């Protein structure tokens, strides 16, 4: 029995999220269906680095599964892609140690949120970037984002219906930078709460549009209440960009190998 790790990109538009849900199309169900076909009907469960919500994309999702088949990593890539739908692509594969765990072994994750700015929406990007008509105060957003760095209780930036009790997380990098189409917000941390990135982005957008001032970010963090933060930003602007395991998993690995840019 061997343990394989795979890197996935997927367009989340037509999925009800990553995790299996009865009667709904999900990324996990499609991957497990493909593996079942390759294994001649035998069920092969997969474990991912984490779940993504309906409409959220990924270019750096990582999963693992156990197999009795003797197939080279590069052949796993082609075999899986042959059986997967067009909106999921395996971009890399590797044989890993038996104790490797895609979820519990992850040391950090990076998410990126894409924003179109301007009077007209680029219809070819409408499923991958959120459109904001008004001009954004980028320096104010950058100032506010700095308050997120470090270890904090992120209760204010967590969905109210979560069952998680420990809401302390560490953010190691956050950037708000102009891009060709508008704005790119990237956030890297050791772990994230449910809807955390989207609530942070929603709050930053309210600061960028003048509904709030940059100094409010510090107050919101200290208040630890979901009611203090901004709205949850739409799912389709978000992409799981990279999962870091402390050392490269794959040959010729580069972050964001299939880019959303």
Swiss-Prot record:
It comes from the Bacteria. Substrate binds at residue 111. The active site is at 53 (nucleophile). One of its GO terms (molecular function) is RNA binding. Its EC number is 5.4.99.12. It catalyses: uridine(38/39/40) in tRNA = pseudouridine(38/39/40) in tRNA. Signal peptide: none annotated. InterPro entries: PsdUridine_synth_cat_dom_sf (IPR020103), PsdUridine_synth_TruA (IPR001406), PsdUridine_synth_TruA_a/b_dom (IPR020097), PsdUridine_synth_TruA_C (IPR020095), TruA/RsuA/RluB/E/F_N (IPR020094). GO terms for biological process: tRNA pseudouridine synthesis. Pfam families: PseudoU_synth_1 (PF01416). Keywords: Isomerase, tRNA processing. It is an enzyme of class 5 (isomerase). Belongs to the tRNA pseudouridine synthase TruA family. Homodimer. Formation of pseudouridine at positions 38, 39 and 40 in the anticodon stem and loop of transfer RNAs. This is tRNA pseudouridine synthase A. The lineage of its organism: Bacteria, Bacillati, Bacillota, Bacilli, Bacillales. The gene is truA.
């Amino acid at each position: 029995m061997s343990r394989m790790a795979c890197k996935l990109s997927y367009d989340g538009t037509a999925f009800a999220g990553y995790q299996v849900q009865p009667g709904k199309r999900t990324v996990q169900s499609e991957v497990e269906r493909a593996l079942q076909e390759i294994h001649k009907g035998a069920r092969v469960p997969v474990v991912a680095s984490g779940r993504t919500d309906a409409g959220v994309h990924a270019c750096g999702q990582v999963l693992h599964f156990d197999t009795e088949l003797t197939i080279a990593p590069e052949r796993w890539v082609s075999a899986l892609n042959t059986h997967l739908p067009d909106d999921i692509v395996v971009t890399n594969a590797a044989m890993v140690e038996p104790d490797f765990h895609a979820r519990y072994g992850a040391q950090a994750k990076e998410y990126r949120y894409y924003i179109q700015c301007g009077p007209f929406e680029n219809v070819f990007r409408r499923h991958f970037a959120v459109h904001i008509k008004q001009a954004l105060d980028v320096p104010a957003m950058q100032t506010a984002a700095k308050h997120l760095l470090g270890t904090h209780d992120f209760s204010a930036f967590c969905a109210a219906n979560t069952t998680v009790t420990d809401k302390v997380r560490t953010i190691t990098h956050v950037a708000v930078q102009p891009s060709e189409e508008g704005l790119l917000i990237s956030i890297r941390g050791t772990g994230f709460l449910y809807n955390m990135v989207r609530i942070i982005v929603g709050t930053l957008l309210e600061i960028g549009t003048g509904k709030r001032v940059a100094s409010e970010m510090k107050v919101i963090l200290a208040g630890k209440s979901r009611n203090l933060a901004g709205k949850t930003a739409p799912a389709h602007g978000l992409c799981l960009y990279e999962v870091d395991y402390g050392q490269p998993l794959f040959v010729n690995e580069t972050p964001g190998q299939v880019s959303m840019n």
